[in-house]
Amino acid sequence: MTNLPAGASRSATDVVVSRAAGTGPATWAMGMLFERLAGAGETDGLLGASVVTQPPGQASPLHVHTLEAEAWFLLQGAMTYRAGERLIRMTAGDFIYLPQEVPHAFRTTGTVPVRFLALTLPGGLLDIYDEVGVPAAERRLPDAGVSDADVARWLELAPRYGLRVVGPPIPEAEA
């Protein structure tokens, strides 16, 4: 519902987003594939949703989100997730929800890429990857991994997206 009379406002019940499989924008960023399902601009800022594919062995630094809560549903593969002091081993079918301000990090384990549904509430956080990355030529992992330039750009943009790095990645030996 996009055609509202002048001066009218929208409510959460007016926002309907439907996307057929494989039709959303796709981005290569930070060595990953992000397939947009719904962005903040489509949901009046209420939700961000993407399917993310991440290669084996990739890890994030320990960080917090100051603006959004985050939820993941693991579709394929295995990963280790640190949430606060908890170390959680996840496999396909597992789910995690994190309120904002909870320090967390993740590392892909095993030999196959992981695919997960990433949700942010409210939306907006996933837009950072559109700024860091480039439109994906195909719906697959990019040939290049994470570059120093990607990391520098992510760190430069992080404060604007309410991201704060607070520690190192999960060591491989702990994953």
Regions found by a protein language model. Give the residues of each.
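A short, N-terminal "cap"/entry segment at the start of jelly-roll beta-barrel domains
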Residues: 1-47, 141-175
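Short acidic-glycine-tyrosine-enriched beta hairpin
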Residues: 85-103
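Glycine- and acidic-residue-biased ligand/ion/polar-headgroup-sensing regions
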Residues: 67-79, 84, 93
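A contiguous, mid-protein "functional segment" used to position or interact
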Residues: 112-160
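Short beta-strand His + acidic residue motifs that chelate non-heme Fe in jelly-roll/DSBH
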Residues: 62, 81-82, 98, 104-110, ...
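Conserved short histidine dyad/triad with adjacent acidic residue
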Residues: 35-36, 50-65
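A generic "binding-loop/recognition-motif" signal
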Residues: 58, 67-68, 86, 102-103, ...
